[in-house]
């Protein structure tokens, strides 16, 4: 899709997908861009006491409660809390790898035990801050894709091709 936006770059860090999506959701609901850093509260923070990060934002008069979990153990805690109805969120991001893709198995290893995901994530957010485009919806290639093929965001064609449905599977007990 050609040159990307800073919002696309931060997909690799925990909280980045949520932040990028909220930027565009704000635009789609208000017709105006927010401050590019308006949703940075969803970014993962080091040494958090809770297994996930949460925040609430106003989008055109509707409060959106968000949660971001990094690592499958933390995701398990979040999912349990949701199932127990201890918490409620309209929007959840789960990154399987600690720190997001920046901490994933495809990253270089230097032989030390030092975790580099947090440092890599900070670099991604810095790249976003310095990017000429900071919003996914302003990416010219994405705009052309919608204009020439998908019609508009949330159109029937876009929903059909870009979104998926999840269904619970009933599995037989282990034998």
What would you call each of these model-derived segments?
Residues 1-175:
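Iron-sulfur (Fe-S) cluster-binding modules
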């Amino acid at each position: 899709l050609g040159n990307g936006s800073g919002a696309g770059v931060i997909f690799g860090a925990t909280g980045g997908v949520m932040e990028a999506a909220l930027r565009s959701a704000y635009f789609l609901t208000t017709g105006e861009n927010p401050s590019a850093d308006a949703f940075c509260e969803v970014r993962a923070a080091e040494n958090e006491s809770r297994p996930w990060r949460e925040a609430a934002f106003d989008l055109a008069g509707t409060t959106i409660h968000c949660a971001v979990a990094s690592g499958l153990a933390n995701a398990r805690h979040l999912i349990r809390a949701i199932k127990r109805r201890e918490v409620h969120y309209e929007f959840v991001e789960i990154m399987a790898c600690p720190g997001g893709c920046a901490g994933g198995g495809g990253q270089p290893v230097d032989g030390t035990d030092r975790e580099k995901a947090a440092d890599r994530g900070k670099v991604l957010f810095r790249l976003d801050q310095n990017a000429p485009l900071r919003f996914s919806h302003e990416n010219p290639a994405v705009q052309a894709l919608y204009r020439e093929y998908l019609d508009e965001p949330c159109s029937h064609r876009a929903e059909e091709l870009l979104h998926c449905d999840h269904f619970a599977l009933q599995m037989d007990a282990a034998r």
